[in-house]
Amino acid sequence: MAAKDVRFGDSARHRMVAGVNVLADAVKVTLGPKGRNVVLDRSFGAPTVTKDGVSVAKEIELKDKLENMGAQMVKEVASKTSDVAGDGTTTATVLAQSIVNEGMKFVAAGMNPMDLKRGIDKAVNAITEELKKISKPCTTSKEIAQVGSISANSDAPIGQIIADAMDKVGKEGVITVEDGSGLENELDVVEGMQFDRGYLSPYFINNADKQMAIMDDPFILLFDKKISNIRDLLPVLEQVAKAGKPLMIVAEDVDGEALATLVVNNIRGILKTCAVKAPGFGDRRKAMLEDMAILTGGTVIAEEVGLSLEKATLQDLGRAKRIEVGKENTTIIDGAGDGNAIKGRIAQINKQIEEVTSDYDKEKLQERKAKLAGGVAVIKVGAATEVEMKEKKARVEDALHATRAAVEEGIVPGGGVALLRAKAAAAAIKGDNHDQDAGVKIVLRAIEEPLRQIVKNCGDEPSVVVNKVLEGEGNFGYNAGTSEYGDMVAMGVLDPTKVTRTALQNAASIAGLMLTTDCMVADLPEDKAPAMPMGGGMGDMGGMGMM
């Protein structure tokens, strides 16, 4: 086992704080509308340029083991805030740095670290409650656009395209971000439920221009097994033919004489049909068929529940206003399912999302939820170069997370103003002793720090601006983008409540752990023995020349 470097007391804390400051100083230059870029080296290809705090934090690894432990703990603040709220990583880092540095001064003065931590926790709880009171619901498209643009470093077009996407697919709908092919950002919306399976035979195509099978007001047969024998299918085909409607078949597979008969009927115009494979595999396929059944008001014909294909009736079939089937995708538009049943299914999927631990499973469940909720929007990010594309794409993803957080918990005035307005609630808190009061004071100083850093990145004097904002009330604050004072909400400078709350709670949590640390243990660097010199006579291998 390798020897360890064990440090106690101030010796340990000083090294840890040094690591905290290196990481936080690198991250905080990105804060605010006039935040600076950070360039990250890559082992191959062009370097990455970013204004995303968590991207900068993830790159930092320090040579000194003890300093690195401090840096990694603050990195955890940024990562956790990003995971929960999707934004606010730089704010969380700035808050953590301030609480740690202020707290260490009191610890060095001989105060009890545990009481300091209790005081910090009391102040944070009071501020969190005050933020909830200040918070307003984020409902309008304009507010969503404003939140998105602030999170994307004051890029208004990004905020607008996210607001448009949410208008199209709803606040519960899935919005994905992809690389675009041009210079401008584009928004593609797929309405209804789309899955990645196409027609089983090109003979089902009835629209030559689009190379698609398009059916209006069809019946939809959902079957969880393979269909090869046409006799099993005949009773359903006869009932649908009498009704004079097209038929869409979604099954594990359709082949042999069953597929041949469907194709012949389709070509002759006897019965307009189309067959596709069910999406997914195993249990996920069953779940997606069940989703389709709920969306279309039909039933999955499955032997497990005592249903068979021969005995299926029109009541077992789903309905939709329109179905479009391409070579690789099928879209069900305006299914005839019951609205309450669809909401119930979405609630059930939401519960599963909370319980699963795998990111892959979570992503697949969110896709299913989106398909039920009414569509998928794809934002295609345009840029002139690949470096710009990566940077812009990261900002769009940040903005998307921020708008979702705003819809979930509401909005507060941005630019660090909400924390300052919550200051009075924390100032009224009295600790059980003098040391706890000092913990409250640490937080009161720390919550000024985000605004100070925003102003500093603008090149202005932080203390002057902070004092002027504190003299005002309500939404009065400093718009760093335009260097103007005024109503932050009216100027469209908004932050999601969830982002501000999460940033403060995570910062206080990690900072509290650091203040109560009294010992650090790290591996000592090993002294590697020098390499063995080459053996004698091997130098120039002179005797090996050709005669």
Swiss-Prot record:
GO terms for molecular function: ATP binding; ATP-dependent protein folding chaperone; isomerase activity; unfolded protein binding. Its EC number is 5.6.1.7. It comes from the Bacteria. ATP binds at residues 30-33, 51, 87-91, 415, 495. GO terms for biological process: protein refolding. One of its GO terms (cellular component) is cytoplasm. CDD domains: GroEL (cd03344). Keywords: ATP-binding, Chaperone, Cytoplasm, Isomerase, Nucleotide-binding. It catalyses: ATP + H2O + a folded polypeptide = ADP + phosphate + an unfolded polypeptide. It holds the Pfam family Cpn60_TCP1. It is found in: Cytoplasm. Belongs to the chaperonin (HSP60) family. This is Chaperonin GroEL. It comes from Thiobacillus denitrificans (strain ATCC 25259 / T1). The gene is groEL.
